[in-house]
Amino acid sequence: MSKSSKKKKAVIEERYHGPLITHGVSLVYIKLYPWIALALTGFLYVGGTYEDDLGIFKGLSLFCGFVNILGIIISFIPYLVNAWKTLTYCLIALTVLSLVIGIDFIGLLMVISDGSSIGAKEIYQSPLTPFYVILMMFLFIFACGLYAWYYLPKNQGKVWAFNQVKEGDRKKTWWDNFAIAFAGATIIPSLLTGYIQIAFGVLLGILLTLTLPAVMVDAVYAAIYIRKHPDYEELT
């Protein structure tokens, strides 16, 4: 192995990433995430822009659509990805944000739906909408702040126990039991009262709103890191 190869390998191994994700965000994400997010954006546009007098869902659809289409276009041109690595990582972060928006929109529809057709007017008028939106916004901001804390200089380089839980570990057993108890406490009353759809909508929103920001924050950190280490990664 040449000296340059050894040096590059050392640089690749040294990039820090926070908890919850096994490996740091890679440039290859730009080849997959925009397609998934674009599908959800299409659903957001179809389901949310009808009778959208306030224009909130139209604006969100345009933002998400622009980000995802730009990501798809760039993904077909590896030269641009490698030339604009910082921009690509930022684009990945925005793509993940559009994923969160799309998934939370689906969760919102599950919460407020009564089986009839739903448009923006029904969403705005539902008494459950503000509670769901405020909850998801709070969880999103909390998750972003929590994951960003792990990237502070004083915390970098640490190996977090959260990422080291293995099969048979007591901590894993505790987390599994907690997850089962939480799901049971949410779903069982919903089954008994007939509100299972609402429960799944809330669980979907909570689960992904708390986890996807880990990818988004790491993508932002990667965009900062790549400016100091331009040879860190290449898309082939």
For each feature predicted by the language model, list its residue ranges:
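Membrane-water interface of transmembrane alpha-helices
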Residues: 2-3, 67-78, 139-159, 220
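Membrane-helix boundary/juxtamembrane motif in polytopic membrane proteins
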Residues: 128-130, 148-182, 199, 203, ...
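Alpha-helical transmembrane segments and their membrane-interface junctions
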Residues: 43-44, 102-125, 180-205
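C-terminal transmembrane-bundle signature of multipass membrane proteins
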Residues: 174-236
